Every structure is written in C-alpha cells, then in structure tokens.
C-alpha cells in the first residue's frame, strides 16, 4: 500500500509541466555501480548475477534522483521477473552526443501482445502472479516519464521465454525545454 502511494506521488510530480528537475553533472559509471551494489542483495537471494559493462567513462547531466529511480526500476524488474540462477546485464556506452544504457535479463520475457502496453500505468503483464511477485504496475510508467524528462528515449525488445532488453538513450548535456 505504501509503495503504491509513493509511486503515485512520483508520477504526479513528473506529470507536472514544471516538474522540479535538479540537473547535476554526474559520473554515470559510478551511479550505475551504486545502483547495482544496492540491488545485489536482492539478486543474491535468487542467485542472479548482476553484471555491469562500462565501455568508457561517461559524465552527463542528469537529475540524480529521477535517473537512479528509472534505472533501478529496470534492474529490479530484471531481477523480479527472472529465473533463479539467471543474470541481469547493465551496459553503458556513449558517443559525442548521447549515452546509452541497456538492461538485459535472462528472465521470462514479455508476450508480444503486451509489449506496447507495459509503459501504461497499472498495466501488469501477468495479473495472476501479481501478489507473489509484488509491485504496483507503475514502475515502468515512472521510468518512461523520468527518461522523457531527461529528453531521452526508452525501447524494449523481448521474446517470451528468452528475456528482455531495455535500451535507454539520454543526451549527455541537458537542455531545458
């Protein structure tokens, strides 16, 4: 119940046109390391490997709280909807204009008919497992809003039974709207 309230408040704040964006120049590599370090105990309970591949040092303008919330949610979902003894791989790369994060997992995948809807508020792919898996159905909506707030994009590639990959692209420099 508390999680639903917290998630709803996050969405409401992000929906405001003049949402408070606190942009700081950050070490993205370190932020990702911190996220994985915080989530590792959850992954370890199911013997899921958390892997971080950073192909180069990346510094960028982000709202630390909103960015961390978005990426944490993708990694948490990779753990939550995975198989025991699976893996979640987070990769970071950049070019002269954008940085790119992929979060890939060895989990159950998303049915093709649900892919278009997973960013909708309260949408759950498999409602029958909602109680045992947990969550509010708001996490991916919050993630998409947070990434959009950074003028970024998110795409999902998935095949049922073969895992899921989320690809995020965010400009290195934040330019206010």
Regions found by a protein language model. Give the residues of each.
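Short alpha-helical Gxxx[C/S/T] motif in the catalytic ATP-binding
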Residues: 134, 139, 143
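Short helix-loop "hinge" at the ATP-lid/N-box region of the Bergerat-fold HATPase_c
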Residues: 78-79
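Short beta-strand/loop element within the Bergerat-fold HATPase_c
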Residues: 85-97
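Conserved catalytic submotifs in the C-terminal HATPase_c
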Residues: 22-25, 44-45, 49-59
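Acidic ATP/Mg2+-coordinating residue in the GHKL
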Residues: 105
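Short conserved segment of the HATPase_c
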Residues: 110-124
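Conserved glycine-rich
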Residues: 151-153
């Amino acid at each position: 119940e508390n999680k639903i309230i917290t998630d709803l408040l996050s969405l409401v704040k992000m929906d405001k046109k003049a949402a408070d964006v606190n942009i700081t120049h950050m070490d993205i590599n370190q932020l990702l390391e911190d996220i994985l370090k915080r989530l590792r105990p959850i992954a370890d309970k199911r013997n899921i490997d958390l892997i971080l591949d950073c192909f180069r040092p990346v510094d960028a303008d982000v709202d630390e709280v909103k960015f961390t919330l978005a990426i944490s949610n993708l990694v948490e979902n990779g753990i939550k909807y995975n198989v025991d003894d699976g893996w979640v791989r987070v990769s970071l790369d950049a070019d002269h204009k954008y940085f790119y994060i992929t979060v890939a997992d060895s989990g159950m995948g998303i049915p093709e008919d649900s892919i278009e809807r997973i960013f909708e508020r309260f949408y759950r792919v498999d409602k029958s497992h909602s109680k045992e898996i947990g969550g509010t159905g708001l996490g991916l909506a919050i993630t998409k809003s947070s990434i959009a707030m950074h003028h970024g994009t998110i795409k999902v590639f998935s095949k049922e039974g073969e895992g899921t990959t989320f690809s995020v692209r965010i400009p290195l420099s934040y330019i206010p709207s």
